[in-house]
Amino acid sequence: MTTKLIPAQQYHDIFIAGQPLIDLRAPIEFDRGAFPSSVNLPLMVDKEREKVGTCYKAQGQQAAIALGHSLVHGVVKQQRIDAWLNFLSANPEAYLYCFRGGLRSQLTQQWLQEAGVTAPYVQGGYKGMRQYLIGVIETAPSQQPLLSLSGMTGSGKTDFLRLRKEAIDLEGIANHRGSSFGKNIDPQPTQINFENQLAIALLRHQLGNHACLLLEDESFLIGRSALPQSFYSAMQTADIVVLEEDDDIRLTRLLDEYVHKMHLGFSERLGLEAGFEAFSHYLLQSLGSIRKRLGGKQYQELQDMMQQALSQQLNQNQTSQHMAWISLLLHKYYDPMYEYQLQKKAGNILFRGSHQAMHEWLDNY
């Protein structure tokens, strides 16, 4: 058998290119974390892997290998090979990887060669590539200056970032808009997948030779996605630019984001009746998540206003009443909290301005 190995020195190229990858690990391993360009076509499923692992601990490697062969043979073995062959037929440049680039990769490569197809496997496997990406995140702040984009809730920071080549959209990677109402219809990635996608975005950003790395001024947690500690610490000391927007535009933007887009998304996913129920639950649950910080009286006032707005929307198909609770939430909760947090970093502020002024300032940064 000819062993074709992709060395660790090519990790950078693998992630920059979005190299198609076959992840040979069991589904339970894949679900904890993998890479964006990978597909899970396991050598062993969860129960098979568990049995082999138990055997390895009790009887050693050779006994575990023998058990693995007895579990994956005949029709089952052929089904696994066919799945790999089908993927490789559509993606002939794909690489294989298992946890450490060991027995599972080698055995899969051997079976594929016996079927007439050569597929290289990645040295170090998942563990090696994962450690490489962790290193990318840890060293990224030293590669170029960080610039933090701040601005009141509803000022359009995400829309602004998406127009800038020197920016990375952390909320896009986390699939969460950062605030208590920031949940999206689709779930957030696992913590490992969030970190892996962030690292790959950083690698690609570094190719652009930009003057800075522009990021939204985020909390440590974006929904349930935690920014890596070293990266978050670097963000806390970064220079700040503040995006300014008129109140009426902020309110209109939040009405669109919290109400129109979320209602439409739930309705398209679940149908009109179930969609409206899920949308209502999203709003009320989001408000409930900040109940303690609002205090009982203000929470009750906002909840009553929200339920009245939902009733109007359901019965009259109008959303204007939502503006009342959004306005109160902004002016009594979000804005004071934002001003307090920004004041602590006032010495780091380099510039304040509108969307247009901010674009012009950054173009000359």
Swiss-Prot record:
Task performed by this protein: Involved in the post-transcriptional modification of the uridine at the wobble position (U34) of tRNA(Lys), tRNA(Glu) and tRNA(Gln). Catalyzes the conversion of 2-thiouridine (S2U-RNA) to 2-selenouridine (Se2U-RNA). Acts in a two-step process involving geranylation of 2-thiouridine (S2U) to S-geranyl-2-thiouridine (geS2U) and subsequent selenation of the latter derivative to 2-selenouridine (Se2U) in the tRNA chain.
Organism expressing this protein natively: Shewanella sp. (strain ANA-3)
Cysteine disulfide partners in this protein: none
Pfam families xref list: Rhodanese
Catalytic activity: 5-methylaminomethyl-2-thiouridine(34) in tRNA + selenophosphate + (2E)-geranyl diphosphate + H2O + H(+) = 5-methylaminomethyl-2-selenouridine(34) in tRNA + (2E)-thiogeraniol + phosphate + diphosphate; 5-methylaminomethyl-2-thiouridine(34) in tRNA + (2E)-geranyl diphosphate = 5-methylaminomethyl-S-(2E)-geranyl-thiouridine(34) in tRNA + diphosphate; 5-methylaminomethyl-S-(2E)-geranyl-thiouridine(34) in tRNA + selenophosphate + H(+) = 5-methylaminomethyl-2-(Se-phospho)selenouridine(34) in tRNA + (2E)-thiogeraniol; 5-methylaminomethyl-2-(Se-phospho)selenouridine(34) in tRNA + H2O = 5-methylaminomethyl-2-selenouridine(34) in tRNA + phosphate
Coiled coil: none
EC number(s) reported in the record: 2.9.1.3
Protein name: tRNA 2-selenouridine synthase
Catalytic center residues: C98 (s-selanylcysteine intermediate)
A GO MF label: tRNA 2-selenouridine synthase activity
UniProt key word Transferase: yes
Keyword terms, alphabetized: Selenium, Transferase
Domain of life: Bacteria
Record-annotated Rhodanese domain positions: 15-138
UniProt subunit comment: Monomer.
PROSITE patterns assigned: RHODANESE_3
Any one GO biological process: tRNA wobble uridine modification
InterPro entries, per the entry: Rhodanese-like_dom, Rhodanese-like_dom_sf, SelU
